[in-house]
Structures are given as structure tokens and as C-alpha cells.
UniProtKB/Swiss-Prot annotation:
It comes from Shewanella halifaxensis (strain HAW-EB4). Its main location: cytoplasm. Signal peptide: none annotated. Mg(2+) binds at residue 71. Residues 4-186 are annotated as: Large ATPase domain (RuvB-L). This is Holliday junction branch migration complex subunit RuvB. Homohexamer. Forms an RuvA(8)-RuvB(12)-Holliday junction (HJ) complex. HJ DNA is sandwiched between 2 RuvA tetramers; dsDNA enters through RuvA and exits via RuvB. An RuvB hexamer assembles on each DNA strand where it exits the tetramer. Each RuvB hexamer is contacted by two RuvA subunits (via domain III) on 2 adjacent RuvB subunits; this complex drives branch migration. In the full resolvosome a probable DNA-RuvA(4)-RuvB(12)-RuvC(2) complex forms which resolves the HJ. The keyword DNA damage applies. One of its GO terms (cellular component) is cytoplasm. The RuvA-RuvB-RuvC complex processes Holliday junction (HJ) DNA during genetic recombination and DNA repair, while the RuvA-RuvB complex plays an important role in the rescue of blocked DNA replication forks via replication fork reversal (RFR). RuvA specifically binds to HJ cruciform DNA, conferring on it an open structure. The RuvB hexamer acts as an ATP-dependent pump, pulling dsDNA into and through the RuvAB complex. RuvB forms 2 homohexamers on either side of HJ DNA bound by 1 or 2 RuvA tetramers; 4 subunits per hexamer contact DNA at a time. The lineage of its organism: Bacteria, Pseudomonadati, Pseudomonadota, Gammaproteobacteria, Alteromonadales. CDD domains: AAA (cd00009). GO terms for biological process: DNA recombination; DNA repair. The gene is ruvB.
Length: 337
């Protein structure tokens, strides 16, 4: 697994960090939400239409790399609809009764948010199908020959599922989501706006160039941008006057070993393994995972997406290949084929 202290890990490092983001930095309404313009425009229409009809919003699947705002969007949906949200995650729902307890406590049009929905157990998933389609819950009462099935009516509700691995969902579950939304990595302009907004919430003075520098090294991910902003603030308060400029942001992030592309030692280790150990590739995922001491799922879900999106790695049928841009990043001359 990825080391817990990896600063640019796009997943939540600890629950305290998540709660701090929840309280202060997360936008509450769509108008406050920055980036993902197409997704935001679609959601605005879907929400307004559901409100006009007085109905629950259709079930929604939000997918994409970690740290892009899937949980935030689920909360915004509940706020925009003026309803409550109950949150859980796939691994937590071990038994059918766990899901039944949540569903039977929903009010009309409430939002049920299930993070990591691709990790639902088959038993729980089977219970979810009639709940999503017919707002009914099929549960078994008793055991053995005396066991019987009863149907409970549920109020209309919106299931919002979030996943980093949409392909891991079963086809029957995926087909029951009427609104699929894919979140993309953020551009520097949108990320710098997020950094500036977060700095304002933190009562931190930051100039435009400082915000851009943090955004540029945040791997297109708001969660990483906010995490780096907090560490840059620490540096600015101890080493300087407390205000953040480009020079201060550069010094702080260099000290934290986050380079100009947003890479840390794990990214560099991955790229250099392909270049040095496997002569630029192609290399299979299992061999690459063994070479850098990581799990293949970590490489696929956390390390690779940004490197591929930025053009440092290519996936081919034969394996991963380091691109010319990867060689240039390390000032290595690519040997002739």
C-alpha cells in the first residue's frame, strides 16, 4: 500500500483532515463549486427538473480518480434538493441488515451516499436492486424452514454512488444509475481558484502567483491542493511573515519534495523504474509493481492516472511505456530504438 505519510496521496490521509475539509473548505452549493463545468451544468438541470416535479433526483453514479470531489458533489446534491444525506461506504455494509437499517430511516427524497460502491458485497447488492428500482426492500424474517420474505415500502430516495473503479461495478448495478457523472482532473486555472477560496476560508493572505504555484503542483486534484496549501501556510508562518507568494510556495514545496510537475518520490520511482530497469518499457503491471514494491491496484488507481493524463506514461497491450516527456523530465537521453 502507499505510505500513509505521502503528502500528495489523493486519498484521505486521516479522518481529522477530512472533517476539517468538510467544515470549512468544501463548497456547499453548486454556485460555489469550481471546475467540472459540464458536470455542474448537467446537475443544475437535473436538480431543477426534479424540484419542479417534486420528485427525488434519479440515482447517480459519480466516478473518477480519488480526491476530485465525489463526496462534495453528493453533499451539494442534498443541499440543493433541501434534503438530508446519510453517508456510508461499500466495505462497511457487510450484511443486508446494515443496508436495511439505513434505507428504512430515510425520509422522502433523502440522499443515501455510498462511497467505494464497487466494494459492496453481492448479498448487499442484491438487496439494493429492488430498493433502487421500486423503492421496496425485500428482507428475510426467521431462519430455516420457518423463514419468510416480506416486502417493505421505502420512501423515494436518491442513491449517490461514488467509485474510483467504475469498471469494477457489476453490469446490473451500473445499469440502475440514471445519472452517470465522470469527474476529470482539474486544470491549473480552476485549481488556483480553489486554492484562493480555501486560503480565504483559512484567513491566509496569498497572491495569485502563489495560488497558481500550489495549483500547478497539485496533480489536478483539489484534495491535494488543499493539503499542500496547509503545509505551505505552516512554512510561511514559521519562515516568513505568514503571507504566501510564489517564492514562498516554491520554497515550501521544494522542501516537501513535491517537484514542478507535482511528482513526489513515488512518482519518480515509478518512472525511473520503467526507464532504468525495463529500458523504457513495455513492462507488465505485475513486474512494475514488484520492481517498486507497490500493489498493482495502487499503481492503477493512484499513481498511473495522472502520469498517463499528463503524457509521461502510455498503456499499451504489451505493458507500460515511458514517453519522451518522462525522459525529458529527468534529463535522460532516450536511446534509439
Amino acid at each position: 500500500m502507499i505510505e500513509a505519510d505521502r503528502l500528495i496521496h489523493p486519498q484521505i490521509i486521516d479522518r481529522e483532515e477530512a472533517e476539517a475539509v468538510d467544515r470549512a473548505m468544501r463548497p456547499k452549493m453548486l454556485d460555489e463549486y469550481t471546475g467540472q463545468d459540464d458536470t455542474r451544468a448537467q446537475l443544475k438541470i437535473f436538480i431543477e427538473a426534479a424540484q419542479k416535479r417534486g420528485e427525488a433526483l434519479d440515482h447517480m453514479l459519480i466516478y473518477g480518480p480519488p480526491g476530485l470531489g465525489k463526496t462534495t458533489l453528493a453533499m451539494i446534491v442534498a443541499n440543493e434538493m433541501g434534503v438530508n444525506i446519510k453517508s456510508t461506504s461499500g466495505p462497511v455494509l457487510e450484511k443486508a441488515g446494515d443496508l436495511a437499517a439505513l434505507l428504512t430511516n430515510l425520509e422522502p427524497n433523502d440522499v443515501l451516499f455510498i462511497d467505494e460502491i464497487h466494494r459492496l458485497s453481492p448479498v448487499v447488492e442484491e438487496i439494493l436492486y429492488p430498493a433502487m428500482e421500486d423503492y421496496q426492500l425485500d428482507i428475510m424474517i426467521g431462519e430455516g424452514p420457518a423463514a419468510r420474505s416480506i416486502k417493505l415500502d421505502l420512501p423515494p430516495f436518491t442513491l449517490v454512488g461514488a467509485t474510483t473503479r467504475a469498471g469494477a461495478l457489476t453490469s446490473p448495478l451500473r445499469a440502475r444509475f440514471g445519472i452517470p457523472l465522470r469527474l476529470e482532473f482539474y486544470n491549473v486555472k480552476d485549481l488556483s481558484s480553489i486554492v484562493a477560496r480555501s486560503a480565504k476560508v483559512m484567513a491566509l493572505e496569498i497572491d495569485d502567483e502563489g495560488a497558481v504555484e500550489i495549483a500547478r503542483r497539485s496533480r489536478g486534484t483539489p484534495r491535494i491542493a488543499n493539503r499542500l496549501l496547509r503545509r505551505v501556510r505552516d512554512f510561511a508562518e514559521v519562515k516568513h511573515s505568514g503571507d504566501v507568494t510564489k517564492v514562498i510556495a516554491e520554497a515550501a514545496l521544494d522542501m516537501l519534495d513535491v517537484d514542478a510537475e507535482g511528482f513526489d518520490y513515488m512518482d519518480r520511482k515509478l518512472l525511473l523504474a520503467i526507464i532504468d530497469k525495463f529500458m523504457g518499457g513495455p513492462v507488465g503491471l505485475d513486474n512494475l509493481a514488484a520492481a517498486i514494491g507497490e500493489e498493482r491496484e495502487t499503481i492503477e488507481d493512484v499513481l498511473e492516472p495522472f502520469l498517463i493524463q499528463q503524457g509521461f506514461i502510455q498503456r499499451t497491450p504489451r505493458g507500460r511505456i515511458a514517453t519522451p516527456r518522462a525522459y525529458n523530465h529527468f534529463n535522460i537521453i532516450k536511446p534509439d530504438a
